[in-house]
């Protein structure tokens, strides 16, 4: 009998491969994205010191979202993370899609962050 491939296990393997090459620095931090079934999260991480500089998620009260699992929520989170990053002085980042396919919510978050001023 055939077993169904575990999508999350494959995503984690992809993410490990990506993380070998994608390293954030103080000058150019890593924009990490995590997508759950109900929400989306983004962090700017300095891998040299292991510190999260800023974060944003669809759970943030300032966004006031009813549903955090759609493209509109991802767009709002992308705009918010870009605004917070610019307040901290980070304009250039390295995008870490977390092993997810660049499509849908991940793409919406990335494009919103670019439109709000982040360069990657």
From Swiss-Prot:
Keywords: Ribonucleoprotein, Ribosomal protein, RNA-binding, rRNA-binding. It comes from the Bacteria. One of its GO terms (molecular function) is 5S rRNA binding. GO terms for biological process: translation. CDD domains: Ribosomal_L18_L5e. Transmembrane segments: none annotated. GO terms for cellular component: cytosolic large ribosomal subunit. The keyword Metal-binding does not apply. This is one of the proteins that bind and probably mediate the attachment of the 5S RNA into the large ribosomal subunit, where it forms part of the central protuberance. Part of the 50S ribosomal subunit; part of the 5S rRNA/L5/L18/L25 subcomplex. Contacts the 5S and 23S rRNAs. Belongs to the universal ribosomal protein uL18 family. This is Large ribosomal subunit protein uL18. It comes from Brevibacillus brevis (strain 47 / JCM 6285 / NBRC 100599). The gene is rplR.
């Amino acid at each position: 009998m055939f077993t169904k491939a575990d999508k999350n296990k494959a995503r984690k393997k992809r993410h490990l491969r990506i993380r070998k090459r994608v390293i954030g620095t103080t000058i150019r931090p890593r924009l990490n994205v995590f997508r759950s079934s109900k929400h989306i999260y983004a962090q700017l991480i300095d891998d040299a010191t292991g510190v999260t500089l800023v974060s944003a998620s669809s759970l943030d009260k300032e966004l006031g979202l009813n549903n955090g699992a759609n493209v509109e929520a991802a767009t709002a989170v992308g705009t918010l993370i870009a605004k917070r990053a610019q307040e901290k002085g980070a304009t250039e980042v390295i995008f870490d899609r977390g092993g997810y396919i660049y499509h849908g919510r991940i793409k919406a978050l990335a494009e919103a962050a670019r439109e709000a001023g982040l360069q990657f």
